[in-house]
Regions:
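Bacterial N-terminal signal peptides that target proteins for export
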Residues: 1-5
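Eukaryotic, compositionally biased intrinsically disordered regions
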Residues: 8-10
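C-terminal motif of bacterial Sec signal peptides marking the signal peptidase cleavage site
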Residues: 12-15
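Glycan-recognition and catalytic cores of secretory/periplasmic carbohydrate-active enzymes
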Residues: 19-394
């Protein structure tokens, strides 16, 4: 249900017009995407992911069978909170509101560390903490989900919790010498030594700081938050983005030295449109102009290098070798980025690219038997044994 992004695609298409009025392609895509979200994606989660206790299952198989004893992740549950909150804010369906409120209560009661601050990484179905490590990634999704719940419902507890997590991340998650946010910590916020690729800072963690702070600023017009949001946006443009390659670097040490040269097409296009959204929310014209130029640049590069002849965005390139499978989230981010590029430029080629990817999704990634989407496709064939609900799959 991380397909909440599809809701954003639909919103973009609904709220934007070409120079000659709404196109047939716009109307068709918007209708098809909203229908898929409401008739296939959300019902799967409503029917199969809701546990009889106060929470949500940590793993659900393709056919809707829950793994009842599976651990439950903080990121998954923050995404569930965002998803039903956003669904209610978009469609005003009381069934979505009920699950948004349920997920808000469960998340606050189960995943917020009342002693040390922050968000637990993993609990068991009874709510006992299995992994109390603190990850910037989980913190940002918690802020994101709680802020969306506030926007959807006006629930002040959600805003208070989101603001509290923001302060915790600023106080304990920032790296003091070179600034930015460290990837992960112990339960009591001591910096760890063992990181993937030896990277204490990652593009992905900062991407979701940018995303979360953008949404929080829509709820809470705080000067300190504004400064940190602008810092994150400029950090992406000035330090994380490699203009010579037209891609974002992914892994860094504390001093912001890039450690691995690889390109993640999904993260690239996601960063482009999120930068535009941040600049728009900040109402900073100079930043907006920079973000728009960068978004077009990186979207163009990814479409040239990563869009396969079958119509999907490939996964990544490392050491000159492109990994050619289609991931669920990469396709959605590509559609969003193409619609964003179309909005910026007015060039219908970008809208056509979005439709090309959507056509691939309809043909290869939507599960017509059980609902929802497959997680991955290889050579145009879906991988059918991957759970539809898991720690990383929402």
């Amino acid at each position: 249900m991380f397909y909440w992004i599809a809701l954003l695609v639909a919103s973009c298409l609904a709220g934007c017009r070409s120079h000659s009025g709404e196109t047939d392609m716009q109307t068709r895509m918007r209708t098809e995407i909203v229908t898929n979200v409401r008739d296939s994606v959300l019902p799967f989660w409503m029917d199969y992911a809701v546990a009889p206790d106060s929470g949500f299952y940590g793993t659900v198989l393709r056919n809707g069978t829950p793994v009842v004893d599976a651990p439950r992740g903080g990121v998954l549950n923050a995404r569930i909170l965002w998803s039903f909150s956003a669904a209610y804010r978009t469609f005003k369906d009381e069934a979505y509101l009920k699950l948004a409120d349920k997920s808000q209560r469960y998340f606050i009661d189960t995943f917020i560390d009342k002693e040390h601050g922050g968000v637990y990484w993993l609990v068991n179905p009874d709510g006992e903490v299995l992994n109390a490590s603190k990850y910037t990634y989980a913190m940002t999704y918690a802020i994101y989900g709680l802020a969306e719940h506030y926007l959807a419902t006006g629930n002040s507890e959600s805003l208070d919790m989101a603001v509290g997590l923001y302060h915790t991340l600023e106080e304990k998650g920032r790296e003091p010498q070179y600034d930015g946010y460290v990837e992960s910590f112990t339960e009591d916020w001591k910096q760890l030594d063992n990181y993937d690729n030896n990277a204490s800072k990652t593009m992905n963690a900062h991407l979701h700081v940018l995303e979360a702070y953008t949404l929080l600023y829509q709820c809470w017009k705080d000067d300190g938050l504004r400064k940190r949001l602008k810092f994150c946006a400029e950090l992406f443009m000035d330090r994380i983005y490699d203009s010579s390659r037209r891609h974002f670097n992914l892994f860094f040490d504390n001093a912001w030295n890039s450690l691995v040269e690889m390109d993640s097409y999904g993260h690239d296009v996601e960063a482009g449109w999120l930068l535009c959204e941040a600049a728009r929310v900040l109402e900073d014209r100079q930043l907006m102009d920079r973000a728009n130029r960068l978004a077009l640049d990186v979207t163009d590069a990814c479409l040239v290098e990563g869009l396969s002849d079958k119509g999907y965005m490939m996964y990544e390139k490392k050491g000159g070798r492109t990994t050619g499978h289609a991931s669920w989230w990469g396709q959605i981010e590509t559609m969003i980025a193409c619609v964003n590029a179309w909005q910026i430029s007015g060039n219908d080629v970008y809208l056509q690219s979005a439709d090309t990817v959507w056509t691939f999704v309809k043909d290869c990634m939507i599960d017509r038997e059980y609902g929802e989407w497959y997680s991955d496709c290889f050579d145009g064939e879906p991988k059918k044994d991957t759970p539809k609900v898991s720690m990383w799959r929402c």
